[in-house]
Amino acid sequence: MSVLQVLTFPDDRLRTVAKPVEQVTPEIQQIVDDMLETMYAEEGIGLAATQVDIHQRIVVIDISETRDQPMVLINPEIIEKRGEDGIEEGCLSVPGARALVPRAAEVTVKALDRNGQEYQFDADDLLAICVQHELDHLAGKLFVDYLSPLKRNRIKEKLEKIKRFNEKK
């Protein structure tokens, strides 16, 4: 397994709309394993393939406190949304930034697992929010898109400044 490089805002590749996985192959399973390793190494609770410059509909999530209950969602689809919720969200692709984002309180999701078997589940609380956040990535959308242009530009400028500083090292 490998830790993959996580793209950071405002990288245009984060705006790519992911394509469906046509067949779950050993190569797709390797991508899933690498994404899980990357998510754990970066101390995230979710990761979409577009964040690691792989433009296929793959998401990994683990919201467990013990970090040993990974979920794999291939070609995920939200088939129902209920209620309203929102928490202050962060993102591995927008380091250091957090913002309150309106989300559905509960979702029903259909996806394939790492073996290509279809399954469906209901999610609420943090899992529902995480699923919606990661599926936004697959559509080329970031949580900063929910913010005002002023706030979004402040975050962009801050991250560009950090990037320039790191490049000088």
Curated annotation (Swiss-Prot):
Keyword list, A-Z: Hydrolase, Iron, Metal-binding, Protein biosynthesis
Residue sites binding Fe cation per the record: C91, H133, H137
SUPFAM superfamilies tied to this protein: Peptide deformylase (SSF56420)
Lineage: Bacteria, Pseudomonadati, Pseudomonadota, Gammaproteobacteria, Vibrionales
Gene3D superfamilies: Peptide deformylase (3.90.45.10)
UniProt-annotated catalytic positions: E134
GO BP: any one term: co-translational protein modification
Name the UniProt record assigns to this protein: Peptide deformylase 1
Annotated family: Belongs to the polypeptide deformylase family.
Catalytic activity of the protein: N-terminal N-formyl-L-methionyl-[peptide] + H2O = N-terminal L-methionyl-[peptide] + formate
Top class in the EC scheme: hydrolase
Cofactor stoichiometry and binding remark: Binds 1 Fe(2+) ion.
Cited function: Removes the formyl group from the N-terminal Met of newly synthesized proteins. Requires at least a dipeptide for an efficient rate of reaction. N-terminal L-methionine is a prerequisite for activity but the enzyme has broad specificity at other positions.
EC number: 3.5.1.88
